[in-house]
Amino acid sequence: MEYEDVIRRLEALADPEAVKGMARFGINPENTFGVSMPNLRNIAKESGKDHGLAQELWASGIHEARILAGMVDDPKAVTGEQMELWVKDFDSWDVCDQVCMNLFDKVPLAGQKVFEWAERDEEFVKRAAFALIACLAWYDKTSGDEEFTRFLPVIVKGATDAVSYTHLRAHET
């Protein structure tokens, strides 16, 4: 699926009432269409993995396009530089969590990024560290306990963090 086709689909599925509801849950309503997650998943399934498309979607700055970018990107093509660029763009908890859950947790650098991002001050960058811990623990069925116990000091420190969305994610871990 081409970038223009995806954007047209998102525009056609726009729901202004959903945008109002999203704003009540702390989601930035700027550049947001209010497209449901099931619809985003369907578009991602139709699009398949496409690193180039993911880059275009992310660059659009559209809320749902960024979530979709995390769904269609190829984890094998993602670099540490891309992870840094995207994490700096996170402006809501749902984009952060969805990108971590659908893409970043499958990138070999995920564990390294946990330690780097947990030390940062930006709210959603720090939250991404804890979202990654949760995703790795949930989805990685092959690693042993030692793979996850290395994150315990990060979790303990984050559980007392005053940053609201980080605090929430640390308690969810």
List each model region and its residues.
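Amphipathic alpha-helical scaffolding segments comprising HEAT/armadillo-like alpha-solenoid repeats
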Residues: 48-56, 77-85, 108-116, 142-156
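Hydrophobic core positions within HEAT/HEAT-like alpha-solenoid repeats
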Residues: 70, 100-101, 130
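Residue-level detector of extended alpha-helical repeat arrays and alpha-solenoid scaffolds
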Residues: 66, 96-97, 126
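HEAT-repeat alpha-solenoid elements in large eukaryotic scaffold proteins
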Residues: 127-133
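Conserved small/polar residues in nucleotide/adenosyl-binding loops
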Residues: 166-167, 171-173
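Short coil turns that connect the paired helices of HEAT/ARM alpha-solenoid repeats
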Residues: 59-60, 89-90, 119-121, 160-164
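N-terminal alpha-helical scaffold/docking segments in eukaryotic complex subunits
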Residues: 1-60
